[in-house]
Design a protein with these regions (language model features):
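A surface-exposed beta-strand-loop module
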Residues: 53-54, 66-67, 71, 75-133, ...
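Glycine/proline-rich low-complexity spacer/linker segments in large multi-domain proteins
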Residues: 8-17, 115-166, 213-221, 557-583, ...
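Hydrophobic helix-coil surface modules that form long, contiguous segments used
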Residues: 42, 147, 155-317, 346, ...
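Short coil-to-beta strand junction motifs in C2/discoidin
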Residues: 74-79, 161, 499-506
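Hydrophobic alpha-helical and helix-loop surface patches within well-folded domains
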Residues: 197, 228, 233-497, 633, ...
Length: 877
């Protein structure tokens, strides 16, 4: 990817010089269905002015902007046919270099026309092309964030150069085209259809979109209280159309419109709102203005777990929120990306909790989003929420748990700090002041300070401009009768963390155990809420009271911090974790325990036992999903190598018993069955999985649909109890893109050195592998819980191949590969030094691009953490 970067300084200088009026983009996609055609014709005409000269009046000659007036426009194309600037032909060989077209001798008003052949992509960047194996139909969609509009047309690729875009798109007969403007009636010629779209509102290039193909859909409308009507549409490819629950998606969208328009006090800014579920999508979704794209595994062809349905709801409302916060009002530069994403993450969780059946969405936020944030914030690459973004590579690696989840948690705290009414009053003022323009964090804070009367400078410094997470520790002393004589919260800075002490609003919940054995209950009997600031904060409300069985610090999850319970509360809470009557306090306690495991302060076996105990009663789908994921990490990474065989067997036995005992047809039953397949190793366990797959010993209420069939088969393959014959048979049964991808995962899961080597070669050598096939192959390659020694040869292979992957792949594909080709699973095997391998690479690559080094450094962080957790477990023996 050399030569495709853009620095903040370059963007700022260009924004000072250039004002873009409009783009006219003509795309000929008539040959898209022919796989032999690797490119398409792109013709871009852009009108722009230069700020150093006065625009010409009617009938006046164009004024020169000065002999030194020059800039550049961005384009990534295999071939540029012609470049015409103000009527002058420019030689592409001279002015088109490293994804830039140099534009010199500019006038006050300029017109540039660029004709190029741009490439169809299979990486989910630019214009992605996909042919559906189910019916051989071809589909296209664009994905432009961060810098990939330039893969489709010539563009000033930065968020603060907004303009109006007019798209004209030619496609084969039978296709439709969706874009930011409403789809017009096409004209017909030579077996093709041409759609000439109306100009868009002023928007940034990264939220423009073209979606083309034989998509199927449903339409509806949102009727606002003031009489406005916004057309709505939902679309997917033809082979999935029967599975798309359009009514639920459209109802959620209508409710979201009503909720946001009232909350923001600002009408929807665009002319219509389409949502298209597209294949092989790299992210969850993308907020293209009025033309949102979602990954199409949100169209459920098999029964999903409730956690997945809730995630779709959050995603739908996240993208809708961006129409106001990100699309109508847009960041000036990518350093405020966090504000776009954090706000959308916060407000979509709030909207889900207040407008859908997922009323406990904040519990999901606690275990999944905040868990992601805490992990990210303790890496060596941690950065402030408001990160310094110096170039495009910086922003590409900052789509992370800090930018999304920590930022959302901090905004939640900000709402509490200024008050909900003041917060949303400030949001209304901010949106009104900057509609269709660009703004910064300072602009938002100014509005919040104005309406709340609070000075946010100190709050902003410690929460947004400083990295890291602090620790809150409960300190309790009692007398011989169990009466609390001293209670305080100690705030600490973890070793090596760049954090400073911060103000927190926290609650302490007092929980009492009642009953015994299976009838025991752990219920809240008291609650104290207070402000924490500085190193020690006394809690006088607890002094003189009888010590509760469990004291939950940060009860109700009000703040963002690592939490350390007192030892008695931790011990009692873990022993009675299945006695909590609500999911949230149980999740908070287990999150604290998990953080201890990751820090090498609590043996993983203790967490494993508590998690299995919690699964006996836990009904919250996202909490179950989170616990099962952490169980997998314990078994594959955090337990010492010598402990794993026994632990895997015992855990799979426990999961099998839980699956058999689960309520028939329940969400928990489905998740537990999948978990058994993931960990099955003994004869009894694999026979049970095989019997579910064949239907010879069905579980009451369990529907073994196609997606579950793949889960069960892949588990058997990874356990060595099924192989190529079974994979090929299942692939022939499922002639879809999902079937093709899951077959790739299954083949990479085969537990032999030969299969792992073959998967490695495909991943590092086949640059044509579609992005989602790559993801599934990586997942299978890493599936070595039962035999981690299979990945030992690839420690040195990784070190050898890393440079080539970075140099030859697009950023997204390189990031995927460099992250997931590394696994800490071999840590602890005799004669293996994965930590030394990565340390050696970093020492010899001090001048490598910062984004490249960051990926490798994060792998090293994870590997060191694995070693620390294993050492903690070994010391407890």
């Amino acid at each position: 990817m050399p030569g495709q970067n853009l620095t903040r300084e370059e963007a700022a200088a260009r924004a000072d010089l250039v004002t873009v009026k409009n783009y006219d983009v003509v795309l000929d996609l008539s040959g898209a269905a022919d796989p032999a055609q690797e490119t398409f014709r792109s013709t871009t005409t852009v009108q722009f002015s230069i700020g150093s000269a006065e625009p010409a009046g009617p009938g006046e000659p164009a004024e020169s902007a000065g002999s030194d007036a020059a800039t550049f426009i961005d384009l990534v194309a295999p071939r540029v046919h012609s470049i015409v600037l103000n009527g002058r032909e420019l030689d592409p060989a001279e002015v088109y270099v490293d994804s830039r077209i140099v534009l010199a001798d500019l006038m006050a008003d300029n017109e540039l026309t660029v004709v190029a052949d741009c490439a169809y992509m299979h990486t989910g960047e630019g214009l992605h092309r996909f042919t559906d194996p189910a019916d051989s139909e071809t589909y296209l969609y664009t994905q432009f964030e961060v810098p990939d509009a330039r893969r489709v047309f010539a563009v000033f690729e930065q968020p603060d150069l907004k303009a109006s875009f007019t798209f004209t798109v030619t496609v084969p007969e039978g296709w439709t085209v969706l874009s930011n403007s409403p789809t017009p009636s096409p004209t017909h010629q030579d077996g093709n259809r041409t759609f000439a779209f109306a100009p868009t509102e002023p928007i940034s290039s990264y939220i423009t979109a073209i979606v083309a193909g034989p998509y199927r859909g449903a339409t509806d409308e949102y009727r606002a209280p003031d009489g406005r009507v916004v057309p709505l549409g939902v679309y997917c490819r033809a082979s999935l159309a029967e599975h798309m629950d359009s009514d639920e998606i459209l109802e959620m969208t209508r409710n979201g419109f009503a909720y946001y328009e009232e909350l923001f006090g600002t009408p929807y800014a665009f002319t219509k709102y389409d949502q298209i579920f597209v294949p092989e999508f790299n992210a969850g979704a993308m907020e293209n203005a009025g033309c949102v794209t979602h990954r199409d595994d949100y169209v459920f062809r098999s029964r999903p777990v409730e956690a997945r349905v809730e995630r779709r709801a959050v995603t739908i409302l996240h993208e809708l929120a961006h129409m106001w916060f990100g699309d109508m009002v847009t960041m000036k530069w990518w350093n405020d990306l966090w504000l776009n994403e954090s706000f959308a993450e916060f407000i979509s969780t709030l909207a889900v909790a207040e407008t859908t059946r997922f009323t406990d969405a904040w519990t999901t936020f606690q275990i999944l989003e905040k868990g992601w944030a805490y992990n990210q914030d303790q890496l060596s690459s941690t950065h402030p929420v408001a990160a310094e973004i110096n170039d495009l590579h910086d922003v590409e690696v900052n789509f992370d748990g800090i930018t999304y989840a920590k930022g959302a948690a901090v905004l939640t705290a900000l709402v509490g700090y200024v008050g909900r009414e003041s917060f949303f009053k400030g949001i209304k003022s901010y949106l009104a002041a900057h509609a269709y323009g660009n703004a910064t964090l300072a602009d938002l804070l100014a509005e919040l300070e104005k309406v709340s009367g609070r000075d946010l400078e100190a709050w902003t410094r410690v929460w947004l401009q400083e990295a890291g997470v602090t620790t809150l520790r409960m300190s309790i002393e009692t007398d011989g009768d169990g009466i609390i004589t001293s209670a305080a919260i100690r705030q600490e800075i973890p070793e090596g963390s760049p954090a400073t002490l911060r103000p927190h609003r926290v609650a302490i919940g007092s929980y009492a155990v009642t009953g015994q054995g299976g009838s025991a209950r752990l219920e809240r009997t008291g609650r104290v809420e207070l402000d924490v600031d500085g190193e020690i904060t006394p809690v006088p409300e607890l002094v003189g009271t009888r010590r509760a069985d469990v004291l939950i610090l940060n009860d109700d999850d009000l703040t963002y911090a690592k939490v350390r319970l007192d030892e008695a509360s931790l011990t009692t809470g873990l022993e009675h974790v299945d006695a909590f009557t609500e999911s949230l306090p149980r999740s908070i306690l287990l999150a604290s325990a998990w953080d201890l495991v990751r820090d090498g302060e609590l043996p993983a076996s203790r967490f494993l036992a508590a998690a299995l105990r919690a699964l006996r009663v836990e009904a919250h789908s996202s909490v179950v999903q989170g616990l099962l994921g952490r169980i997998t990490v314990c078994l594959s990474h955090y337990l010492p190598q010598e402990d794993r065989p026994v632990a895997v067997t015992a855990t799979a036995d426990a999961l099998l018993a839980l699956a058999r005992a689960a309520e028939a047809g329940s969400d928990a039953q489905l998740q537990l069955v999948r978990a058994v397949a993931d960990h099955a190793v003994t004869e009894e366990q694999t026979v049970a999985v095989a019997a579910w797959l064949s239907g010879s010993q069905p579980l009451e209420g369990l529907v073994v649909d196609q997606d579950l069939r793949w889960e069960l088969l892949i588990g058997l393959v990874a356990a060595g109890r099924a192989g190529e014959d079974e994979i090929a048979a299942e692939e022939s049964r499922d002639l879809t893109t999902t079937g093709r991808e899951r077959a790739a995962q299954a083949r990479a899961s085969v537990p032999t050195a030969e299969a792992k080597a073959a998967a490695w070669r495909r991943l590092v050598e086949d640059a044509s592998m579609p992005n989602e096939t790559q993801v599934k192959t990586l997942r299978g390659f890493r599936s070595v819980e039962r035999n981690p020694e299979l990945l030992v040869p690839f420690i040195e292979e990784y070190v050898r191949e890393a440079d080539a992957l970075w140099e030859t792949r697009t950023f997204h594909m390189a990031e995927n590969l460099l992250t997931a080709l590394w696994s800490p699973a071999p840590v602890g095997l005799e004669g293996v030094d994965p930590i030394g391998a990565l340390e050696g690479w970093l020492a010899s690559h001090r001048d490598a691009p910062a984004a490249f080094r960051r990926i490798v450094a994060e792998n090293l962080d994870d590997t060191r953490r694995v070693a620390g957790a294993q050492a903690c477990e070994a010391a407890a023996h």
